[in-house]
Design a protein with these regions (language model features):
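Conserved alpha/beta-hydrolase
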Residues: 1-4
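Alpha/beta-hydrolase active-site loop
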Residues: 9-29
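Short acidic-aromatic active-site loops that bind/stabilize oxyanions
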Residues: 11-14, 134-142
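Hydrophobic helix-cap positions at the C-terminus of alpha-helices
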Residues: 28, 52, 155-158
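Short, well-ordered alpha-helices that flank and scaffold nucleotide-derived cofactor binding pockets
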Residues: 30, 54-58, 150
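Alpha/beta-hydrolase fold nucleophile elbow
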Residues: 32-43
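Alpha/beta-hydrolase-fold enzymes
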Residues: 44, 48-137
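Conserved serine/cysteine hydrolase catalytic core
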Residues: 137-159
Length: 159
C-alpha cells in the first residue's frame, strides 16, 4: 500500500497497476508455460487488463473485459471540474486526501442504497469486509482520481 489509511484507495500512477499486473502474469507464465493465459477483468481491472493485453498481446489466449472503466464516475461533478480539482490537489501535495464527499470505511451502507443486484452476495461481502481490514478499501483519493483520469486519456488516445 502506498498510504497508511486502509480505507483510502490511492495510487501514484496508473502505470503501477499495469506493471504489477504484468509482473504477476509473467510469474504465472513462467510457472505454467504449457497453459494458456486467459484474462477476465471487470471495471478498473478491465481498463488495466485492456492496457496490459495491448502492451503484451502475445501473452493472452483470450481476453474478456466486463464494463471496463474507460472513465471513472464523478457523481454530479462534471468531468473537467473533477479532474481539475484532482490535479490542483495533487500539485499542492493533497493527493492522499479523500475526494470531496467521500469518507473512510465505517461499515454503514445497505443493500437498498447499493448498486448490488443480489442481496445474499451483498450481505456475504459486507460481512467479509467487516471482518477483514484488508478488504475495507472504500473511498478514492485525489491521487487515485488523477491517476484514473490519466489512464482514461491514455485509453482513449491509444485505441
Amino acid at each position: 500500500r502506498l498510504t497508511a489509511d486502509p480505507s483510502l484507495v490511492h495510487i501514484d500512477t496508473w502505470r503501477r497497476y499495469i506493471r504489477d499486473f504484468l509482473k504477476a502474469c509473467r510469474y504465472i507464465k513462467k510457472a505454467h508455460p504449457d497453459l494458456a493465459l486467459n484474462l477476465y477483468a471487470h471495471s478498473m481491472g478491465g481498463a488495466i487488463g485492456g492496457i496490459a493485453a495491448a502492451w503484451e498481446p502475445d501473452w493472452f489466449h483470450k481476453v474478456i473485459l466486463s464494463s471496463p472503466m474507460i472513465r471513472p464516475l464523478t457523481d454530479n461533478v462534471p468531468w473537467p471540474a473533477a479532474t481539475g480539482i484532482a490535479l490542483e490537489k495533487c500539485i499542492f501535495g493533497k493527493d492522499e486526501e479523500y475526494v470531496a464527499g467521500r469518507k473512510p470505511y465505517d461499515g454503514s451502507g445497505s443493500f437498498e442504497t447499493s448498486s448490488a443486484t443480489s442481496k445474499p452476495r451483498y450481505e456475504r461481502y459486507k460481512n467479509l469486509r467487516a471482518e477483514h481490514k484488508e478488504l475495507q478499501t472504500w473511498s478514492p483519493s485525489y491521487g487515485w482520481l488523477w491517476a484514473s483520469a490519466e489512464m482514461s486519456w491514455y485509453l482513449r488516445l491509444n485505441k
